[in-house]
Amino acid sequence: MLTDLFYSTFGCLYSPTSTMDVMGTARRKTVVRLNVYDMYWLNDYASNIGVGIFHSGIEVFGVEYAYGGHPYQFSGVFENSPQDAEELGETFKFKESIVVGETERSTSDIRKLIKSLGEDFRGDRYHLISRNCNHFSAVLARELTGKDIPGWINRLANLSGSIPFLEKCIPQEWLTPIVLQASVDEKKRGSVDSAEEATEKLVVRSLNDSRTTILDNRTANGAIIMSASSSNSDRICMSPSSSSSASSCDTLDYDDLIVQTPSTFSSEKKSRSNSPPIFRIWNTIKATINGTQQTAPTGAATVIPASSASNIGKTNSTPGTTSNGLAKPTCSEC
């Protein structure tokens, strides 16, 4: 009586499409299907010897997972729309869908499983006889449901000794469905783009390191400091001198950059003449004659005392000349 009451009350929780986990909540089961495709015109010849050549994939949660070959060392497992032969190619024709069983795995669990199987079912390890799409379908179906797929799906592998030439007769595009080839091309483009981006970053970093090294070597004996950056122009900072504690900065272009060292400054000083400019000589002469204060362009003043100015024009030892060696003006010149 109590048992009947229990099942009448809670029997819905024990339906074929759900189970109970340890927490007492229902876990929904999902149907797992095996979709079979016929390589139709090749089977016209293979059927004469009692062997069919089929492609298969496992459908779960509205996605079909299958395996194909390519020459690269990464996964050959791919996804496609269930029962869509056009995504596979012209040589594929949908044949039938077979329910293998049910699974309690979630979508995230299945994706982890697919990724794990992809490490074993690599594209470059594909073999038409010993490691083909049907072998992958059998492994995935067993992992999800604990059941095997029908034996006739992969009969070709069991009779491979009878037709050793068959693999060479099948075109390569049959081993690599269109949807798998598109996935491979996309992954290759992504790898190339990543490699190019990494190379560009490496070149830029190398250039920046070179600029910094060169400028550090110049700064050891020079008067400027540069902060390296990735742009064409950088911050140029003048090192503070002994008389000034502040440093001035400016933004200059690399093409216009001229680094001056102390040796350059000293060579510039040596190249300059120590003799005063002509206008300073003329101002000195005028100040000497007039006995007035004259301000030089540099701000220094020259003062001629009046006592000294009174002696201007007196002869020294040579007639016709003044004490400073200048000729006396004649009457006509006056």
From Swiss-Prot:
Expressed in the pharynx, hypodermis, intestine, head neuron and tail neuron. Residues 30-174 form the PPPDE domain. Transmembrane segments: none annotated. Disulfide bonds: none annotated. The keyword Mitochondrion does not apply. One of its GO terms (cellular component) is cytoplasm. The active site is at residues 55, 133. Its EC number is 3.4.-.-. One of its GO terms (biological process) is proteolysis. It is found in: Cytoplasm; Nucleus. It is an enzyme of class 3 (hydrolase). Keywords: Cytoplasm, Hydrolase, Nucleus, Protease. GO terms for molecular function: deubiquitinase activity. The keyword Transmembrane does not apply. Residues 310-325 have a biased composition (Polar residues). Residues 310-334 are annotated as: Disordered. PROSITE patterns: PPPDE. InterPro entries: PPPDE_dom (IPR008580), PPPDE_sf (IPR042266). Disruption phenotype: Worms lacking both POST and ubql-1 have a shorter lifespan and display an accumulation of ubiquitinated proteins in the nucleus. PANTHER family: DESUMOYLATING ISOPEPTIDASE, IP06716P-RELATED. Belongs to the DeSI family. Protease which deconjugates SUMO from some substrate proteins. Has isopeptidase but not SUMO-processing activity. Collaborates with ubql-1 in the export of ubiquitinated proteins from the nucleus to the cytoplasm. This is Desumoylating isopeptidase 1 homolog. It comes from Caenorhabditis elegans. The lineage of its organism: Eukaryota, Metazoa, Ecdysozoa, Nematoda, Chromadorea.
